[in-house]
Amino acid sequence: MDNLITQLINLFAAVILMLAFAMLSQRRILTLIHLFTLQGLTVVASTVAVAYVTHQHHLYYSAALTLALKCFLIPYLLHRLINRLNVRWDIETLINIPTIMLIGIVLVVFSFNLALPIAKLSASIARGTLGIAIACFLLSFMMMITRAKAVPQVIGFLSMENALFFAATSATYGMPMVVELGIALDVLVGVLILGVFMFQIREQFDSLDISHLEKLKED
Amino acid sequence: MDALLLVFLTPLAGALVLALIGHRAYARDLNVVFSLGTFLAAAALTVRIISDGPLFALDKQFFIDPLNVFLVTLTAFVGLSTSIFSRPYMRVEQDHGKMTPLRMRLYFSMYQLFSFTMLVALMTNNMGILWVAMEAATLTTVLLVSIYRTPASLEAAWKYFILCGVGIAQALFGTILLYMAADRVIGDSADALLWTNLEVVKMQLDPTIMSLAFIFLLLGYGTKVGLVPVHNWLPDAHAEGPTPISAVLSGLLLNVALYAVIRCKVLTDGALHSPFAGNLMIGFGLLSVVAAAFFLSRQKDVKRMFAYSSIEHMGLMTFAFGMGGPIANFAGLLHMTVHSLVKSAIFFAVGHAAQQAGTQIMEDIKGLIKVTPSVGWGLMLGSLAILGMPPFGVFASEFLILTTAMRELPWATPFLLLALGVAFAAIFSRVQEMVFGQTALKPLAHPPALLPVFVHLGLALMLGLYIPPYLDVWYRQAARLIGG
Amino acid sequence: MNLSGLLSQFLAIMAALLLAPLLTGWVNQWRAWLQNRSGPGLLQPYRMLRKLFIKESVVAESASPLFRMAPYVAFGCMLLSCAIIPTLSTDLPLSPAADAIALVGLFAMARVFMALAAMDIGTAFGSLGARREMLIGFLAEPALLSVLFTASLISQSTALTEIVENLAHRDFVLYPSLAFAGIAFCLVSFAENARVPVDNPTTHLELTMIHEALILEYSGRHLALIEWAISLKLFAYSCIGLALFFPWGIAEAQAPVALILAIPAMLFKLAIGGFLLALIETLCAKMRIFRVPEFLATAFLMAVIGMLTHFLLGS
């Protein structure tokens, strides 16, 4: 049974990676939010699976916390945000999507290589997942780089946080509870501040296009 | 222990109170009072440490050792003087209509909250809490950078948020890896991230994981230190935010971030038995010093110019800590202190000067010495101090760093000298034009607060001529703690 | 080679030949129902084949022998590939003839001949269709190969029968790499079988058609063979998919009872698969042809990540 659940965790890891790629190639902002929610759910599911196998009860709490935050509160805030700002446009990427995908593969290879020596050492149940977490981290990073609009950048930022949380649960069975609470608080406050920001940006520029924010350059 | 709690509970209380009444006229004074309270608590704490030695609090989650106690005192002190400086500064901004009552409340409460997060970051024993506090420090300042709501300030704040957010996410990843390494040695307990515990077992931490962890931690916290090439947020945030915030960012936040890097380096060195971490820091430090010096010479905005100077000096400190050894560490710590004091003094003077001129463009600021001699002299002396002129403390620390570099890394010395030379020429020529020359500037409506400027410069001067024995002991103990 | 091997091989070929048009009919019927139409009936493909075989075949004057040969080659390729895919049993005497890589080669050969034949006449539509078909093929083949490689990595063999034997008759293990491969395979199958997101099999709108443009010049028995080959291709792809990702119910060697049970199992799986195909076709809109490279790049990427995941997760 435990063996099966370990495989399940690996499968969740694969799904998270798949969703990271889906987000990378997604043009619609609403779908992007749905994918982000789905990724959050998968992370929660894998956390619960880890908690079940390792009997780490505090992981159930952090799974619940993540569920509330990543699957309900933040998606709700994002939905409200795009409704209020009325931004449902398609996102134009700065590089065309097949190229992004190819770079994505390179990133995955890179992060798998990076994680391989550690995976060999690790005694944790799902040792391969660290590489996937690094890959998701880098993919979200690239998503932030390649999008010129504010909302997708924020989603990229949050999905980066998802990857980190996944790394923490699968590779080390979760951080100490104080730290996790702190991280959750920071993320929540961060999202609120970003929301405030977007209103300010739109007030100033009548647009959420980050390319307006390129005045401050080195002369 | 009471003093320890008081040190960070005072700013937290201040943040709450000022969030409610920050728009009242007396809030400016209240801000000073809270900062003074923090400073007094920090001073009391210092006295305790001198007599009793290192101590813990709250189930070992917080601790004070020779390394962080002097940074706590420094932070509380610069926090106090900046609050004194922001009294007249914010009054002028209010008169200019840049600050609404709501923004004043935001400003004061965030200012206190920012002090709180930095003090927590310095005093926490838990590497995870350190991360949380660093992220919180970004969050509290990001709204302050965009407080004027101008397009440029929004852009700066967005950049600050996104770049530091990404950077700090890398640091979190490094922390997770650190926990993974600790997990294998200490076991899966909530105490596995306590620095004091990690320090004990650092020899047994797995080298592969630790080297990867350190790369992420250095990149992450290095973003907040302002190391090139992840420095882009720094000049913008410094130039577009209110000047008191520029002063605390440069004088304090960068120090705290570097402090986090040093803590991580100690652990990595122990695990790796090789100069890997030090070499990385030397590389990033040297790159920052050289790149910042050249960027610096091309700036037109005075606050941007001094922001680049901060990058240069942080690079120099990173370089020094990277070399390691008692002398370089000593010099790095000394440089940290004097740079904080001098750079915040410069920003105070620059703030007043920019308010007089109504602009931050250096070409439009002329003849300060004729209008307000004290501001002019403050800027001139501060610039000379930051450029490493004897007898200021910066000279002493830079001299120590350079001589160590000549002995240990002879190839790096020409680069350092070149960078310092370029920076000297750039800053000195610009500042000379700003201080002297014909002018059409008008004096300020409210008398500028120049006490902090000259107190800071005086302290920097003192540290250049004479380091008091107890300070010397501190530095030596801290330098030994960093080891390397 | 023994009797039961011969029997299962014979059964596999007969099943493919007879059931392939039925599968096409089933998918079309469901498509009609899902679109609120009454539909042509399940047996329509058989009626059409009969009609086409009776009709006279008209060949253009400028056609070379290649044009006449192509339908037979395509049909032969598809039949051979159906023969080596373990649809009912893994005990196939023909399977050593071709492994997974050769299977992709067989598909490619059929494609090349069809494209050549389309250009042979010299009409504009033929060349256009050929060009588009080759574009899709050249993008889809690496993806399909990577999918098959992922599966062969798990069982350390490129022979389809061994892969299926490994997957079906070992302890149940979740393979994350197969999840990626599965998605990639679905995408490739849509493209290769000219189904909706990539191509519309029922279209005769000149500008959008890909596959139909290739066979515009064919008639009579040639067309019948091509239609049958197309049905066989869909059948082959469905069976590869079922064999790799849902291998339960496929019989092993020397198991006559299992062989008999495998027939209803296969019918059941194909019925569900066909329904899902119709459902997806109804839900999706056909994409612009410029988007197809992106679509297939995604498939390729998924397959490659599947392989990488296999190396990393190592299970």
Regions from the language model: what does each represent?
Chain A
Residues M1-D219:
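Alpha-helical transmembrane segments of multi-pass membrane proteins predominantly involved
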